[in-house]
């Protein structure tokens, strides 16, 4: 199937006015050995964007044509051909640890604490708490709702609750990543505002009861899915290799100004890691500044 689809897509890609660096990245990604699922993840949205581009060209709709090309540029260099940063891989590796230690706020306990705090609501759900706090301290409490499967206990070579150096690196890198995106809201996908990342456990009824444990456990799973999607799919950091590749596009003297500006718009949300090779110090992030005439 992949070879048949590529036979249709590759000539269309070559006919677009995109820079050769983007065309090579696209071609390499499509023709590399991968599962049908991974191939479809790229081929389906790419086909849609190319169809939009061709229709816009036939209608001589310049705006729609440029929008389709912008989408292809962004998806190629930021998503399809962009290696995940180290803390994304560690997120997957230590998923169960994050699931059982992800910070939460139990509304039942919050209501009960009002009397103790002289009628004041002592909430930890505000973004300011997450921006100022040491994230390791926020992860110190293990939640009682997520159960560890026996199979995971048998397979694990380390204590599932131990704050290993790798897990500390992961948590602090996630904290830096979240704080960076909050501080640079112009980078967010669809101008999305990031709420507090803690799990909120609501009161179920007027009696103050909360949901069953299984439903609460699902809240943690959904929140981690949301966090992963926000940091690594919708707003992924640009890899150092891709940053260099795009810099080469911007500094290519043969590129027309209109095409350079197209790339500028497509890459306006670019940011990358300052210390991508670090394995001890948590990752830091900075906005990418493209110098374009």
From Swiss-Prot:
<keyword id="KW-0496">Mitochondrion</keyword>
<comment type="similarity">
    <text>Belongs to the GEP5 family.</text>
</comment>
<dbReference type="GO" id="GO:0000002">
    <property type="term" value="P:mitochondrial genome maintenance"/>
</dbReference>
<protein>
    <recommendedName>
        <fullName>Genetic interactor of prohibitin 5, mitochondrial</fullName>
    </recommendedName>
</protein>
<dbReference type="GO" id="GO:0005739">
    <property type="term" value="C:mitochondrion"/>
</dbReference>
<comment type="function">
    <text>Essential for respiratory growth and required for maintenance of mtDNA. Required for cell survival in the absence of prohibitins.</text>
</comment>
<dbReference type="InterPro" id="IPR031455">
    <property type="entry name" value="Gep5"/>
</dbReference>
<dbReference type="Pfam" id="PF17053">
    <property type="entry name" value="GEP5"/>
</dbReference>
């Amino acid at each position: 199937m992949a070879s048949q689809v590529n036979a249709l897509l590759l000539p269309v890609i070559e006919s677009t006015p995109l820079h050769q660096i983007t065309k090579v990245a696209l071609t390499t990604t499509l023709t590399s050995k991968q599962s049908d699922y991974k191939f479809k993840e790229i081929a389906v949205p790419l086909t849609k964007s190319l169809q939009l581009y061709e229709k816009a060209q036939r209608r001589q709709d310049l705006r729609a044509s440029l929008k389709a090309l912008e989408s292809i540029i962004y998806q190629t260099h930021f998503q399809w051909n962009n290696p995940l940063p180290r803390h994304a891989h560690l997120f997957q590796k230590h998923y169960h640890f994050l699931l059982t230690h992800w910070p939460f706020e139990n509304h039942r306990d919050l209501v009960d604490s009002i009397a103790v705090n002289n009628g004041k609501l002592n909430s930890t759900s505000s973004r300011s708490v997450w921006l100022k706090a040491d994230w390791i301290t926020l992860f110190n409490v293990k939640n009682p709702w997520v159960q560890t499967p026996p199979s995971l206990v048998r397979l694990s070579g380390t204590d599932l609750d131990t704050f290993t150096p790798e897990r500390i690196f992961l948590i602090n890198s996630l904290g830096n990543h979240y704080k960076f995106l909050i501080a640079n809201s112009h980078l967010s996908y669809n101008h999305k505002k990031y709420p507090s990342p803690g799990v909120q456990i609501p009161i179920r009824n007027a009696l103050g009861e909360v949901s069953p444990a299984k439903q609460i456990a699902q809240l943690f799973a959904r929140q981690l899915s949301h966090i992963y999607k926000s940091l690594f799919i919708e707003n992924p950091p640009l890899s150092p290799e891709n940053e260099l590749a795009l810099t080469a596009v911007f500094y290519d003297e043969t590129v027309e100004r209109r095409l350079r500006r197209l790339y500028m718009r497509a890459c306006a949300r670019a940011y990358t890691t300052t210390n991508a090779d670090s394995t001890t110090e948590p990752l830091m992030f900075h906005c990418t500044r493209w110098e374009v005439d």
